[in-house]
Amino acid sequence: MSQKFKELINSERPVLIDFFATWCGPCKVQSSVLKTVKENVGELARIVKIDVDQFPAIAAEYGVRGVPTLAVFKNGDLLWKES
């Protein structure tokens, strides 16, 4: 997954990563909002969910210490991150 993740964030198209956990209440609320955002942005950007329990190494590599955490990448650069 790590190589696929790196390919994903190296895209010219912006990528919003939603670092979440299945047990996280606020993550569930945020998920419905992100579905609406995804419908509105269409092909302008990608929105991808990463379960921190399934991929803890990726979460750790990008300094995710709590969920939900959102991060925006473009061309491999982290443009914004918020928990």
Residue ranges and their predicted role:
Residues 1-14:
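A short beta-strand-turn-helix
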Residues 12-13, 20-23, 66:
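Short pre-active-site segment immediately N-terminal to redox-active cysteine/selenocysteine motifs
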Residues 16-17, 47, 70:
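Hydrophobic beta-strand anchors of alpha/beta hydrolase catalytic cores
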Residues 18, 31, 35, 61-62:
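ABC family nucleotide-binding domain
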Residues 24-27, 70:
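The canonical Cys-X-X-Cys-His
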Residues 28-42:
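Typically the conserved alpha-helix immediately C-terminal to a functionally engaged Cys/Sec
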Residues 52-59:
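Structural microenvironment flanking redox-active thiols in thiol-disulfide oxidoreductases
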Residues 66-83:
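Non-catalytic, surface beta->alpha helical segment in thiol-disulfide oxidoreductase systems
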